[in-house]
């Protein structure tokens, strides 16, 4: 078929069948197969044409709001990088759909979602989108959810993940917590403090996982825990460090906020520090006493596209683990290189 010029009108069935030496019934079956593969298209009242090109499959990435790409954190940008790379290499299109104009799940722009259907391949990152999951089910989309491990099951998430068209990639935070505490111990530190965002949230698995790791690696030690607020106020951050780290005679601190990283670098340059969930060495101003965890979101994004396009039952539910890096061994890595 590809020996014919794209856009060419094929002969009428009776003539084409004679030319090919087959019956008209056989020809009709063959044309039906070619049409299903987008190699020909039938135009009622005109005939059958050779297609100009085979339509690419489309990957749809849902975003909370139109500005999410500009505002997004490193992990989302790296995830998108992997998705774009996969779409380019696997010859499919990528579209992004903003769910809400105001970044509010109760203010959904439904008209942006109405084109989703049984042929749609949809990527979802995080639990923010759960209120539209029933809509995605009703639309019969094929969905892949990338999400972090939680302390408790999130509502009826398990029911969604049992559906045959739903896939998920889980980020193992328990493993991350254990690896970070173990790395701290192997580096010679024995009295950590944890000043991290979200430690007071009930469904956050990290407080439980971090305490379990400390109980196993540092039996008898009860580390200070403080659920840090997102702030750039240096005096507030210093006050928290003095209270929970310095006065408690801690020899290492774990953080997950960039503002704490900056303040520690300026005011406590000799304080060993573990940074959770860091995805790029770019703008990471560590020293030889710093280490960090990183999930390979470029790889995760790439494999998410592969799963939607070609995945099978055996790969529907996957668990990803992080790696731990010392800043002193990673500082020569080029920006953006993973």
Locate the predicted segments by residue.
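Periplasmic-binding protein-like
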Residues: 60, 118-126, 144, 193-197, ...
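An alpha-beta-alpha
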Residues: 178-218, 315-332
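Flexible loop/turn connectors
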Residues: 242-338
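N-terminal helix-turn-helix
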Residues: 8-44
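Short, cationic-aromatic polyanion-contact patches
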Residues: 12, 46-58
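Flexible loop/hinge segments that line or gate small-molecule binding clefts
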Residues: 127-176, 277-290
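Hydrophobic alpha-helical segments within soluble ligand-binding/sensing domains
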Residues: 158-194, 237-242, 293-314
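Amphipathic helical "hinge" segments at domain boundaries
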Residues: 54-121, 214-221
């Amino acid at each position: 078929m590809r020996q014919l010029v794209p856009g060419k009108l094929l002969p009428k069935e009776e003539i084409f069948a004679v030319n090919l030496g087959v019956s008209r019934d056989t020809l009709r079956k063959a044309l039906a197969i070619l049409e299903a593969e987008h190699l020909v298209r039938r135009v009622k009242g005109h005939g059958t044409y050779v297609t100009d090109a085979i339509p690419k499959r489309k990957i749809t990435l849902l975003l909370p709001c139109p500005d999410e790409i500009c505002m997004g954190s490193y992990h989302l940008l790296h995830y998108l990088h992997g998705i774009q790379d996969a779409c380019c290499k696997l010859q499919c299109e990528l579209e992004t759909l903003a769910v809400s104009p105001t970044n509010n799940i109760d203010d959904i722009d439904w008209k942006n979602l109405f084109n989703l259907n049984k042929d749609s391949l949809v990527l979802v990152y995080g639990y923010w989108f759960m209120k539209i999951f029933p809509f995605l089910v009703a639309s019969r989309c094929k969905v892949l959810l990338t999400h972090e491990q939680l302390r408790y099951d999130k509502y009826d998430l398990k029911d969604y993940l049992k559906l045959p068209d739903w896939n998920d990639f889980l980020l193992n935070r328990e493993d991350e917590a254990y690896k970070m505490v173990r790395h701290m111990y192997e580096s010679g530190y024995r009295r950590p403090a944890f000043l991290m965002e979200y430690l007071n949230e009930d469904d956050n698995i990290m407080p439980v996982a971090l305490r379990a790791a400390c109980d196993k690696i540092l039996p008898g030690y009860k580390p200070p825990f403080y659920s840090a607020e997102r702030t750039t106020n240096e005096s507030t951050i210093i006050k928290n460090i003095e209270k929970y780290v310095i006065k408690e005679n801690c020899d290492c601190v774990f953080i997950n906020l960039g503002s704490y990283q900056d303040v520690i670098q300026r005011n406590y340059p000799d304080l060993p520090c573990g940074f959770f969930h860091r995805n790029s060495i770019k703008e990471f101003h560590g020293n030889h006493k710093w280490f960090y965890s990183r999930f390979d979101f470029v790889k995760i994004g790439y494999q998410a596209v592969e799963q939607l396009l070609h995945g099978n039952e055996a790969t529907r539910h996957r668990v990803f683990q992080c790696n731990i890096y010392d800043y002193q061994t990673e500082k020569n890595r080029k920006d953006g290189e993973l």
